[in-house]
């Protein structure tokens, strides 16, 4: 829908006026349910083959990012926001019904602030009038919007009117208020009851309508980046004073994060983690099997992107499709439509002549408006033809998604014919980009309502009818906020929160919400200057081959559910809101000094990446570098010290938590220290809940300036996950290997290996049946400097595992290799305690790599390693160096 700068609120006194405006903008005419079109074969005249075809290979070239709770530092480690809550502050508090707002008013009054408290049920116009009168002498300093602390109750028990009223109280009135007071740029702190994790935990959102308020808040922050904006989420609770204290505290500290959750005194933001699809040929249990009996309901079906996705689903299923859109059913015999299909530009002349024949001036705006109508008709026809070409059946319904009765009639048809919906794809919506100061209430309600009311009407009509999966079109605007899109962001974040809540309310339905970035080659973002704007922002536009196939990949790869960001490079869209962001690095000085040799200083607490530390390492100072040279010349960071760095960083925020395991470690690229010069590396750890544990998504990265490049090249060298638990792992016992038979001496081992004294951890090795065994060398030189710093992941014991496995590979396969993966490493408390007798390791090869166990002389397990895999070096080990190892390890 094209922006109309002359649109005024007074022109839309009723919903009928709004619907009429949409139909006028899109060229749609009302079509009754009796007019639903059923098409069984494509027409010969329509050339509607999709321009792009979905491709799983293109999907897998992009990261699959999932929002998840990300632990934030305590407020004592955060910098002030700059907000003053005291004399001279004029603060509006929109109250909840549970008493939190009332407690907050008392606290603010004690601080000397002037307060205007308004009930959430207050009519919007009355709210605006009260604020206008109150702000005559002095503008607002800030707003506490607490209406979304109230639980709206089960959504299935609401009717359309109560649904709209619930959203009016929460977000429509919020927009109207900020449209009025935007020039004063008041701070905004909202409260919600999504569960304390903004719905990104395994349990799902509790009161999902609050998601609309959070989406609005994120976009307000993007429009006014210098203003404090916080969306504070809580679990269900009857507490009032404690929550009011939290709201005050969050107002005063940590300006670097909008989405804040509070659970058991712990602070959580929302970060992103990459969760890739499984291999195409190895879908996980719970994957959907699309076929000829599959039933699809798709809204927004006349959009070019949705049409292409429909074609992809149809081609790979041949099922039954119910396509819903405001646009009328396309007539393949329409001469103008056929002209558009043949040559869209030539139709402009025809349209101009038709406008002139009506006695109107054929302006470019009128011509483009009419051309857009034919674009939607062509997209609808393309979807219809794709379904029928695949042998499927298509029913096209021209329907306004805001019309509950019309939507119910369509869904009742499906219920009568099939009794179920396998895939409900809600893509209907429109976007009118306009800043808060210019966006009238009618525009906000229109953009918000098509998505929000459309979803409600669909699910209300479906009732308890089985639905296999729902897929809601969201956008990166909903995930990150976007200037000029407070309505679009609010609606999209609402759909994401509802999808999260369905884990509670409809556990048998896989509810998915996709945060799309701008598409390349197809859709509105390809027009005008948008591609150039995206390029300037560093945002990678979505390859259509990937976007078209993405939904099919989500459905058929496993039991995926929840919110997913579908994008390549996010650029400034996901840029931090604060340079620090929000955290005082000096608050971690003592913790860093006690952590170990791999943590230098805290750089920032990133919203997306978690806690980020930097460390400068020098091969001339650190034995673990000087004695670890891959070609006996260039120092390499040992893989085990990469693991150590991940563990040290992960425990900085929660030093009282114990290391339970290190999981899914990938050694992606060697970290080399060229010419023995120092290098600075960064380690990030994004901590999120995982059942009763905490799981840290970790990366080890470094930058290097290459000749001819203006900017440093950043490389991710290692990735992995650190699992933390409230208690230490339980002690384990295992029988140590029996030392007997032929042996490989330390001299023979390190004639083959490149390690120097500090990493010559094998004293002697031997074969123990179908596995290798080795004894740990005693009296090794220091691993690091200063030597009194602790290590947390027993790096040289894990190195013992690596080297024992490597000896088996040399002796059995004649291959020299480097680490590439560890599925799981467990360092038990005994590894840090006094041990009895010699330490030994066994390394046994299985289908998923080597499993290794390090024990002391009494059989206490110190380290367990699972799934250790390697990658062969390009240069083979000379035969004379292999021979003594092969003589012991080979049959």
Specify the residue positions occupied by each region the protein language model found.
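NAD(P)H/NAD(P)+-dependent Rossmann-fold oxidoreductase cores
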Residues: 63-186, 241-246, 256-474, 529-548, ...
